[in-house]
Each structure stands twice: as structure tokens, then as C-alpha cells.
């Protein structure tokens, strides 16, 4: 039975001698071994720690020799085993949590002198090939180098597979639970599987130059909400992003250049951590009202088909308000939870896409819509010119929930 992880062996005598441990783990293969003998059955179990420099490894007897297990962070792939003799703490990290739990269970049995129900190894040196699983970065930039029959190393944190002609995301990639950066640029991928959202540590996702036409709602509801920091969707065929896209609130860098975008998500202002936004060479006619809420360091909207602000507003006021409109406003104003298990799905969609008045209230189908220009420097420190004439202004939509709000805010439309 073996476990691949990082190991640090700390002597508990060091503090008494005024010494400090170096504080850094090394990549190792841990083996649960038994010493075999022809005359008697194997009864002694050992923990063998092998590293790339010491393939024969260092062994520690386990039977009645474990003082304590520290497993508070076992779900994060971390644990510590304290031995009696020698007086050392074996600190384990960067392990697959399920494998670590099984390995620790086997060590407990060995400590008690019980039979281990899983296969155990003999005391033999570890092969160099086993350390290939510790690679944290792999870059593949051609079809001929792409592995067809061999799995990706489980410990990968950075994987790039560009110019490989991929038409779909390889399911083997979705088993890399330590992955932090995934670069699938310059392929032919048309659709993203929802299981990408299971990569709980994924911080950077590069899908530049593919054939994507959409970004799924399932990904917006996944663990990417808490992990994803950078997303590159440039050079695809995306026309619109779902309103749920704005739930990816950890995003800091978003690239949407060279798509077919006709609008931003209406709630884009909810991306409170967004600092770099690039959406050059799309088909944006105007910006949504919540665009004003962004606080960017860099903004590039060059080459979009921005329209001139309309002189006359679009009036869609209802008098009196319908029951649907009144109920929707009440639900949103009071932040009452809703979902498809409570109300029909199409009503959930209506609530998700509700407009926000300049006064902060919500409106569904009863509103006044006006368009004005906004200097992009009001939301970004650095602004790329929006056209060849040196402009830094773009049209932005404003909504008003009532005639009173429109009259009181009419100066902003001049």
C-alpha cells in the first residue's frame, strides 16, 4: 500500500537543542511494508519513506509505536503522525484526501498489531518512475505529445494543452483535484462539461481561441464561485453570458475579446473583485446600468459597435402595477429567497433579470429606459480608447421604476 505526498520528518529533540527544522517538505512515496521471513509469518509492519534522493528509503516500525494521529486537516490532504521511537513527527501534505484516509486507517491497524486487509509491500526500493506522479506542471503544445493511453500525473497544479486539436475537454483532466491553472487555448472545444466545476482549487481557466458559443449556468453555480480568479474566453463565438455568470464573484481578470457579444450580463456590477476587463472587438451596442458599480484597474472596449444615445426614453410604465410586478418588486426588495422548487422556473428567470432603478429599487416589466454616455474613466483607472477617434465614452442604459424617479434623475440623461 502506497501514498504519494509531501513529507517532512521533524525531530522533537530539536527545540531542546536550540535548533529549528528547515520547515519544508519533500516529495516522497510512503509504503506500508511487512518484513517477510521463511520461518514465520510476517508480523512486523513498517512505514517506509522513500524520496528521489533516497530511493531505498527510511523505515519506521509501526506496531505499538504510534503515539498520536493529528487529522484535523485530513480533508485538505494534510495529517501528522507522531511516533514514540524515534521521537519524530511525520508531517504529510499535498495528498489526495481519500487515499490519505485509507493509508492512515491501515497505519492504525498496523500499530495495534492487527492484520491489514489491503495489500502491503515488501521492503524494496522505490522505482524512479513512481516519482513522475509528483509533477506539478505539464505543458503540451502539439498533437504528437498529447498522452492517449497514459493518465496525467495526479499532482498537477498547472496543465496546458494547446494546439492539440481537442474538440472536447478530456475527462482525465477533471480528475486532477489539485489543478489550479488549466490552459486549453487554441483548440476546437465547443462545449464545457459541468464537471469542470468540481475542480475546487481551479483559479485560472484559459479557453482562448476555441469554438465556444456559451458559458453554462451549471459552471456559474459550481465551486468556481469561490476559486476562479482569471477567465479567458477570447476568440470564441459567445453572444451572451448568463445572468448567473455574475455569481463568479472572485473573478479579478476577465477576457472576452473577439467574440460576438451583444450584451454584458445585466448584473455585472456584482463582480465586486473584478479589476481587469477586456471585451474588445465585439458587438456591444451599449453597457448595462450596473456597469457603473464596477471598480476596475484596466478596461478595454475598443472596436465595439456602440450606438448613439437615444434622445427619447422608452416608456413601459404600467398603471396600476400588475400583481406580478408588485409581487416581484416586494420579493426582491425584501430579499425573500426563491427558487424553482417554490415558484415556476420562468418566474425565477424573470426575477434574476430584473432591472435596478437608479434609486436602488427593482422593476420587472414596468419601467422607463433611458440612454446616456458615460466616461469610462469613472469606473477604470486605465482605459483603452473605444475607437480610432480617441474616445473614452460609451453609451449606458439607465432604468427608472416610476415617473417620479425619471423626473428627479432627468439631469443624468442630458
From Swiss-Prot:
Q: What biological function has been recorded for the protein in this entry?
A: Substrate recognition subunit of an ECS (Elongin BC-CUL2/5-SOCS-box protein) E3 ubiquitin-protein ligase complex which mediates the ubiquitination and subsequent proteasomal degradation of target proteins. ECS(LRR1) ubiquitinates MCM7 and promotes CMG replisome disassembly by VCP and chromatin extraction during S-phase. May negatively regulate the 4-1BB-mediated signaling cascades which result in the activation of NK-kappaB and JNK1.
Question: What GO biological process terms does the UniProt entry carry, in alphabetical order?
Answer: intracellular signal transduction; protein ubiquitination
From what organism does this protein derive?
Homo sapiens
Q: Would the keyword Repeat turn up in this protein's UniProt record? A: yes
SMART domains, alphabetically?
LRR_TYP (SM00369)
Please report the name of this protein according to its UniProt entry.
Answer: Leucine-rich repeat protein 1
Q: Name one GO cellular component term.
A: cytosol
Pathway field: Protein modification; protein ubiquitination
Q: In which tissues is it expressed?
A: Ubiquitous. Maximal expression was seen in the heart and skeletal muscle and minimal expression seen in the kidney.
Subunit structure as annotated in this protein's UniProt entry: Component of the probable ECS(LRR1) E3 ubiquitin-protein ligase complex which contains CUL2, RBX1, Elongin BC complex and LRR1. Interacts with CUL2, RBX1, ELOB and ELOC.
Q: Which UniProt keywords apply?
A: Leucine-rich repeat, Nucleus, Repeat, Ubl conjugation pathway
Q: Where in the cell is it found?
A: Nucleus
LRR repeats mapped onto the chain: 155-176, 178-199, 201-222, 227-248, 250-271, 273-294, 295-316
Q: Which domain of life is it from?
A: Eukaryota
For this protein's source organism, the top of the classification is: Eukaryota, Metazoa, Chordata, Craniata, Vertebrata
User: A Pfam family in this protein?
Assistant: LRR_4
